[in-house]
Design a protein with these regions (language model features):
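Juxtamembrane helix-loop transition segments at the membrane interface in multi-pass membrane proteins
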Residues: 52-62, 105-116, 293-312, 621-627
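Conserved catalytic phosphorylation-site environment of P-type ATPases
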Residues: 63-71, 173, 273, 283-359, ...
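Membrane-embedded transport module
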Residues: 247, 509-512, 549, 554-627
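Conserved ATP-binding TGD loop and adjacent catalytic N/P-domain core of P-type ATPases
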Residues: 399-401, 427, 433-577
Length: 627
């Protein structure tokens, strides 16, 4: 508990003790009255002060005003009727403050889930000067500076490891508890915790442009993006509170005046009591507090899973998603090409791969890198000479004194070499050695292990249509779509074509339904912004993704798309439950109070009891299922 919460708890305990003594201990009337008043001012002085400030600032109608008028009115009525029973007035204020403390603790709990993410902000960076480590502000570190990260410290700035090996805890960013091993040459991002070894990192970004700064900015701005439900409750409260105040005034004045005109007893005390009861019941705290808290808890629960949602309006949109469109590369597939087969080769596979890797060693193309990776170990580039790159076809080189050609079918035809068709799906690299066909190598983008299950999980989450967009060949796209079980796909698309496809799908969706686009955030900014909701996957370290998307998944796990949708739907379900429950109970109690069938104790339940139950329901949004 915070100091403020502890202070409130002590005030409540003191007031409760005085209240119980005055209520149940046989005491002289004067002493009993004194205890009631001490208890009332102990627990309620801040409410009275806020109500007075509101009146002075001409912002009269709020929950503080309602509580002040109701309790002061109840005390005045007890004085007027000389009953000496101030218990109800004190009880209203006491239980109201108990409810306020409870909701403060609930907000604190959900805020801590966001604060845990905020703890990724580093306090300092270590720079070595004159053989000693000096702590400096991360903002002062220039790009290209080598910083030292000790075990247990946060990596303060994005960079590349130049020395040391370690394991990194990325849980605060990704929600993934399994440490990630890093070695020299690996890129690291700010916000991760170094667990084992000392690392020296060369910074590649300024602190303000680093991942941790972008994420913190995103989370700090999330509260400004309010949902329709929150905006509705804000507008509702602005109209509702003055309306019930005037309603209570009418209830206190009009029936006695009518009785006076008709010659019946005025019974002012009865109607004033009913009006005060009406005021207590009408307090909109349950709605005003629990609705924003539900969204806040939903955002907090999602962030603990490595799903960053930029505001409650996006959470609300995500809950209505019925169509999910994927960009294939980097979302459903690894985005990393791998050798998946060597066919019809008269020579040893390893030797053919070595020839291909050496011939392609001067190229930075992903296919060349996949050949070098499949070959294993470091390549001896002295073995290759006379490299001739033939644009759009392949490469010809001399390896170990042999003429080696590696490329597509057009290169083979150009060299007059007969080649064999491959039925495998992927990029085919045909090989020729000394003018003779030596077989072909199949290179494919590998499908993520849980991509198929992610599509199935989306269906279970209520998504009706999944579509895959890709720039790959029709044959490759068809195989991936069939393997994953997506409903539809479009192949051989340029970036502009993807925008057109999303616009077409937006025109086909039903009323009240939303379309989500999932991309890796690197080349997808136009499509991410065009969809109802843009989801960037694997965005750790990607500024473009964090800027362009509405929802940011901090790792490459496609299962988190369905999890994010489930979290959003649970949150919205809780919001609607609270709205219906709070309005239903209050409407019933308001009618009973106006008819004189509900006393002040029923009013306390209708106010504080409903608020506590609504807040308890709201913090359920923090809990996320692990499956």
């Amino acid at each position: 508990m915070t100091k403020k919460q502890k202070k409130m708890l002590y005030r409540i305990l003191i007031a409760a003790a005085l209240f119980l003594a005055a209520k149940f201990v046989p005491l002289p009337p004067l002493l009993s009255t004194l205890l009631y008043f001490i208890a009332y001012f102990t627990v309620g002085y801040d409410i009275l002060h806020k109500a007075w400030k509101g009146i002075c600032n001409r912002r009269v109608f709020d929950e503080n005003f309602l509580m002040a008028v109701a309790t002061v009115g109840a005390i005045a009525l007890a004085v007027y009727e000389k009953s000496g029973d101030y218990a109800e007035a004190v009880a209203v204020m006491l239980f109201y403050q108990i409810g306020e403390l409870f909701q403060s603790c609930a907000v604190g709990k959900s805020r801590r889930s966001i604060t845990a993410l905020m703890d990724i902000r580093p306090d300092y960076a270590n720079i070595e000067r004159d053989g000693k480590l000096e702590q400096v502000d991360p903002d002062e570190v220039e790009v290209g500076t080598v910083i030292t990260v000790q075990p247990g410290e946060k990596i303060p700035i994005d960079g590349e490891i130049v020395e040391g090996t370690s394991a990194l805890n990325t849980a605060a960013l990704t929600g993934e508890s399994l440490p990630r091993d890093v070695t020299p040459g690996d890129e690291v991002i700010s916000g991760c915790i170094n667990m084992t070894g000392v690392l020296k990192v060369r910074t590649t970004k300024a602190f303000g442009e680093s991942t941790v700064s972008k994420i913190l900015e995103l989370m700090e701005n999330s509260s400004s993006h309010k949902s329709r439900s929150e905006n509705f409750i804000s507008r509702f409260a602005r109209v509702y509170t003055p309306a019930v105040c005037y309603g209570a005034l009418a209830l206190a004045v009009l029936p006695p005046l009518f009785n006076l005109i008709s010659g019946a007893p005025t019974v002012w005390g009865v109607w004033v009591y009913r009006a005060l009861t009406f005021l207590v019941i009408s307090c909109p705290c349950a709605l005003v507090i629990s609705i924003p808290l539900s969204f806040f808890a939903g955002l907090g629960g999602a962030s603990r899973e490595g799903i960053l949602i930029k505001g409650s309006n996006y959470l609300e949109t995500l809950s209505k998603t019925k169509t999910v469109v994927f960009d294939k590369t980097g979302t459903l597939t690894q985005g990393v090409f791998e050798v998946t087969g060597v066919h019809h080769s008269p020579m040893e596979e390893r030797k053919l791969l070595a020839y291909a890797a050496l011939a392609e060693c001067a190229s930075s193309h992903p296919i060349s890198k996949s050949l070098q990776k499949a070959c294993g170990g470091k390549l001896d580039r002295s073995r290759v000479m006379d490299i001739e790159e033939r644009s759009g076809r392949g490469v010809v080189a001399t390896v170990d004194g042999h003429s080696v050609a590696a490329g597509n079918s057009r290169l083979m035809e150009e060299l007059g070499i007969s080649w064999q068709e491959c039925r495998s799906v992927g990029t085919i690299v045909h090989m020729a050695v000394d003018g003779a066909y030596a077989g072909h190598i199949v290179i494919s983008d590998v499908v993520k292990p849980d991509a198929r299950e992610a599509i199935a999980a989306l269906r279970r989450a209520g998504v009706r249509k999944t579509v895959m967009l890709t720039g790959d060949m029709q044959k490759v796209a068809a195989k991936v779509a069939e393997e994953l079980g997506v409903d539809d796909f479009r192949a051989e698309l340029l970036p502009a074509d993807k925008v057109s496809e999303v616009e077409r799908l937006l025109g086909e969706k039903g009323s009240g339904e939303c379309l989500a686009f999932v991309g890796d955030g690197i080349n997808d900014a136009p499509v991410l912004s065009r969809a109802d909701i843009g989801i960037a996957m694997g965005a750790m370290g990607s500024d473009a993704a964090i800027e362009a998307a509405d929802v940011v998944l901090m790792d490459d796990d496609p299962m988190k798309i369905a999890k994010g949708i489930r979290i959003s739907r649970k949150c919205l379900r809780i919001v609607y439950e609270n709205i219906v429950f709070a309005l239903g109970i209050k409407a019933l109690c308001l009618v009973l109070g106006a008819l004189g069938l509900a006393n002040m104790w029923a009013a306390i339940f209708a106010d504080v009891g409903v608020m506590v139950l609504a807040v308890l329901n709201a913090i359920r949004a923090l809990r996320t299922s692990k499956n």
